[in-house]
Amino acid sequence: MYLYHYFDATTGPFRNLSDLPPEEAKSVLTDIRVKRPNSQPAKRHDKCVEYRRNCERMVRTEFAKKGGLIKRLSPHYLVVEHSPWLSTWYENCVCIKIPVWEFDLRTVSFTYGDSMPTFSPTVDDDKEYRKQVYTYDEILEIIDRYGLPQDWNDDGKYGPERYIEAQVWSNETIDMYLSEYQRSVVGGA
């Protein structure tokens, strides 16, 4: 299994609005709307950072209850396997692909679908994976049961789940790939 991180090449990987103070996050979002109006992040509503932080709190709490190791307040976001839909989100989209075994799996939680709709009070369809956080072993069982959402719902026709989100609650493996990416950008310039 591979985890993919999609991002805009002009800003770089593993940049999370939740890592910023609220006013700075709003400023960055405004800047995205002005400079990259055709990107998916430009379409986010004004309260998206507030909603995202609340969602992260719920995911973090549920993962900790399962014995997950939390080494960051906000996770790094990746998805399980390639998502054709996510690859269209950014004007200059690139991705980093990381084998799941390179992570300490005690620091990785999963939601079947993006965590925002998974934990949204407005999505109430009684599917077993709503409002659920999974460990690696648990998500493998869910994948065995339902498959990968991008294989049966990449267009979102059957609900909000279009991919499996992986939340990485540490920097160790991420820092290694971030350094490698930065070296490749500097070396390629």
Task: Indicate residue ranges for each PLM-predicted region.
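Short N-terminal edge-element motif at the start of the domain
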Residues: 34-70
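Conserved NAD+-utilizing ADP-ribose enzyme module
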Residues: 1-2, 8-42, 72-74, 83-189
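Short hydrophobic beta-strand that contains or immediately precedes a catalytic carboxylate
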Residues: 77-79
